Amino acid sequence: MMQTQVASRAGYSNLPQFGAGIAQDIKTQAINNLKECLKLTTINRFLTSSYEEDAKSVERKIFSAVYQMTKIGLIDREKREINAIWFTFVGLSAQNIRHLEICSITDFNALFSITNQELRSLADRGRLDVETKRKLLQSTVILQNHWNAYHSRTSSGSTDEPSGQSTPAIVTPSPKFNVPSLSVTSAKMIQSSSMGFATTPKSPKTSSRLVHAIPHKWHRSTKFRFSGDAVCHFCQRPLGFGFLNAWEKCRSCKWKVHTQCKGRVGDSCGLTPDHLRFLFDKLIQENNGGMWKDPQSVPGSRSMNEPAFQFPDTAIDSSSSTNSSAPSTPALPAGISGNVSSLTAPYRSERKFLFPDTENYSVHNRLPILVISEGDHPTTTEIQQETENHNKSAAASMSGNIESEGTIVANHEDSTGSQEVDSEAAPSQEAVDKFNKRADGGFTWERHAWNMSTIRGPNAQASWNEVTIQFETIEFDKQAPIIGRGRFGKVLRGFHYGDVAVKVYTMEHISDASKKAEEFKLEVSAYKNTRHDNIALFLGYFMSDGQYGMVMSLSKGSQSLYTLLHVVREKLDLATTRKIAQQICQAVSYLHTKKILHKDLRSKNILLESKNKVVITDFGILSMKRLAHPKQKSGYLTSKFWTNYIAPELAMAMRTEYDEYECDDFPFSENSDVYAFGCVWFEMLTGALPYAGELPHQILFAKTQGIRPVLPNVKCTQELKELLVSCWNTAPQDRPTLTDINLKLTALPKKPRVNRSPSFPVMMKSYESTF
């Protein structure tokens, strides 16, 4: 599809004068080249998390467009049709495409003749949402880069084109005659024409790669500099001011370096920090660190001598690269598959609830059974009983699992009961130190995942020792040690250089005792790398005699948002509601920038130290493996109201029975956290839970069918309703980010403070009075 400008820009209208036979040969050769470039349509993997249902029909349209491009003399209508097919495949709506056509973007010549800034301005004028605008800009850049890369292969051996002329679209050369080509001059195409890519080796045995080798265009400035604030982009030292300081500037990327540093920069023009940041983010998402997927689902590394990350512009061995092919095939960047048939994968959020196969399960055609706890808060008798048990034992009991009512919720496990951890099942010291041990002067690389928590190097053990706390050094409150308990453990009140909250977890969901310490360290790493005013402060962790827990700062005098809304039943005004929502967005979006997912965002996990301070707790802990333990018959043991917050894609991932070796974990993502935030936002607006009064299996069924919660008679502005509905979009990629939500909440006008005399009231309607 990316070749759709071949005919119009390569001058195919002149082909008949050379004869039908020659024209047919060129047509056949062009089709072969175009089919190879159709593999580049896997660019959609960079744009969306999954594919749409009509991917097959889009592919057929693209193939049809390829054949149309080989026709002689395309008319404007055909060009518009091909252009619309590409934009549709990228993800633009018919209204967006119409807007671009009105702005004279009718073909790829016009698309490549404008700069990124101009294209962004057109998208803003067309009121494209943030996600659609990102798709348009990103697809245009990648599309043009692949055109230039393919052109460098087809024109190997030829001289460089003069600056100022654009790289033409893919031209099929012929040994008998030269096909004239059209060129378009623009600022954007000038930059692209200067991009030089390494020539792909002719031998298929050698590595095939795409190298970032763009030379800088240095020129020495003779102007007198009054300011000495500028620094060298290479050595980060000041450039100085005046004529005596020798420095040069690149005409293309505007880099400024010392003259002595120029020779060490290399051909890196255009390799901006934003580009490197995009590659780094893509690295985290593709490798799926421990915070993104369950560690068992992350594939191990191929070799300890191989780099943990292959940039698209670094060499890739041909034996392991799916892009290695014959010399006539263009080299593709790493991460882009060459299998066109993979485009037909169905879009997950649009499929219905899948029941398990009848031959594998004894229960058929029904949703999983969710066993709900009887209450959300421990009774006085239960707390006293737990206190007596604690005073009798040297350490706290390991029953349950901490859920977060830290938020602390009392979970009544009737049929399953509490199970204490056997001290004999505690992992050995060798298993505990396995993560960071050294042998023979080298490192033992535990490459289960590449993530922030994997600390490599000689200081790895020292870094973990800084946050390791001996369980015996923690003093527990003898009168009332139990603050609360939840689905995944207990929270105890203790003293360790100050008042602390000790969260004790069970790791019974890990069948292999030797892996419990390693799995717990992966969970701890999510807390270990966070520092935010609205996130519970992590002080350390302990692993002793089969006991696993974390020491957190104690929020004194705090209560959960759930307690405030549903127990105290306090009504929140708009100013307080917005302030709480903004702090939630800031805290969770901070976790997302750290590549950490909350996974269990709900009002019970949101503490209020005051109406001006929010604390987020219990993130990154929930998993299907934890939820499935202890094993229930055709269901799961969950806390109350848990199903009210889960996203539709999580509801569709649940099965009636869980198999550790066959079932995948929940498809958690940033979008699922956004859906949960929408439910919390609904609670603060209405004082009620979404799907209130419905049974858990009814809620699961409604979410798998795309049925949204009913909006009651909420007296609020249209902006707030639209914000709420956008968080509940069935398609995950259509939901806004928490950063965008925070910006929208900030943009809402605040209630002005009006100083007026009681004798003369002002008859005006404030913004908050509509709430």
Swiss-Prot record:
Zn finger spans (Phorbol-ester/DAG-type): 215-269
Reactions catalysed: L-seryl-[protein] + ATP = O-phospho-L-seryl-[protein] + ADP + H(+); L-threonyl-[protein] + ATP = O-phospho-L-threonyl-[protein] + ADP + H(+)
Pfam families attached to this UniProt entry: PK_Tyr_Ser-Thr (PF07714)
Region of interest: Disordered: 152-172, 290-339, 414-433
Stored PROSITE patterns: PROTEIN_KINASE_ATP, PROTEIN_KINASE_DOM, PROTEIN_KINASE_TYR, ZF_DAG_PE_2
One GO term of the biological process aspect: positive regulation of Ras protein signal transduction
Names of the cofactor(s): Mg(2+)
Keyword check for Coiled coil: no
SMART domains named among the record's database cross-references: C1 (SM00109)
SUPFAM superfamilies: Cysteine-rich domain (SSF57889), Protein kinase-like (PK-like) (SSF56112)
Compositionally biased spans, kind Low complexity: 318-331
Class of the enzyme per the UniProt entry, highest EC level: transferase
Protein name per Swiss-Prot or TrEMBL: Kinase suppressor of Ras A
Organism encoding this protein: Caenorhabditis elegans
Gene: ksr-1
